[in-house]
């Protein structure tokens, strides 16, 4: 066990698989299987999930919606994903709690930092939904914020690619992957990892970020064990 407490950031797009929209139950099942191994190893795990598989605030804003309104709709989409993820994890035998930044007590606990930490200490997975509760902030920034609040040792960003590249590997065959890089390199190079607010938060709080491919079975466990997969960003 390389990390005692970790925060896993899952994009909404990751949950939809190849469907193009919504949630692929097979993806949820695969994530639950990986997470079960992590919890069994003794690592405390929190998860922040995005909502882009259902609704993305920026796209809504581009289509003419008020930006704040669009972001609130996006936050509600993350709650749908969080509850679905909770169901999948619990069916895999993992005790899980959902906490939301916008209060909706009939379906989830409100976000309370000390309660979240207590859940983690008891071996429960905590899934954070509704972003940070404020428009104009991404779920990547939420991941950095929650990681700092719960004193996580690391942020894992599970994506569709196997690390950070100097350019889009899907478009350019000569794209080069970084094994390690600094927060300053990411910020000055404008590399597509997380938005600058999220990167700056992790930089200021000295929380490393590991970017890896979610769709390779067992990768979440490998990342938690400290195996050299993906790209590691640190000070």
Swiss-Prot record:
SUPFAM superfamilies to which the protein is assigned, alphabetical: Carbamate kinase-like
The record's section on Gene3D superfamilies has: Acetylglutamate kinase-like
Residues annotated for ATP binding in this entry:
9-12, 52, 56, 159, 165, 168
In terms of domain of life, where is this protein from?
Answer: Bacteria
Q: A GO molecular function for this record?
A: ATP binding
Enumerate the Pfam families for this protein. Answer: AA_kinase (PF00696)
- In short, the EC number is 2.7.4.22
Entry-linked PANTHER family: URIDYLATE KINASE (PTHR42833), URIDYLATE KINASE PUMPKIN, CHLOROPLASTIC (PTHR42833:SF4)
Subunit note? Homohexamer.
Q: What is this protein called?
A: Uridylate kinase
Name its species.
Answer: Synechococcus sp. (strain WH7803)
